Amino acid sequence: MNWSDLLQWEGNPLSQQAQVYEQQAQAVTNASEDLSDRANGLSGSGQTVTAAQQALRKNVEEMRKQAESLHSLATISGDAAKGADEIGKAARKFDQDAADKSIKIGADGSVDYVGKKAGSLIGGTQIMTNMAAVADTVSLIKFEADELVKDIQKNIAAVESGGKPQTSGGGVSRLDRMKLPPKGASPD
């Protein structure tokens, strides 16, 4: 996962796709209810009517499964949108915070000091502390992004195999607690 990619992550396209899936699920649900009503409305008796009703009910059941899958995909897309948006915002904010401390984060996530040379040992130690904090936070953001991708892939595979996706815990991410040490903080 490249840092430059994470800077571009946004949730809006995934959020829009979640809405499309939800609309499709509703359309399939409505169609299955209509078909169910028609199957129940068949009148007459005999093997032909019974066979037609059974075939229609089987189709209704398949349509309901399809609607459930579409609802699941909408949920997955919504969770992905939230995660991508959170990660993208955290990466962009942190990239700016690092730049404010004269630390450049490369496209691959590498960290370089681009400011003036330190005038003292304490200044040099502070620069090294800041660089270590930036490197750690870049690693954390990249880790969170990788975990999000793995979770989304796992959930899509679950839906494809007829199962249900894991719901996101909705817990507070570590991303919103990431900050560089304040100016003048001791290296300890």
Question: Model-derived features: where do they sit?
Answer:
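N-terminal secretion-targeting helices of virulence/extracellular proteins
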Residues: M1-S168, R174-L180, A185
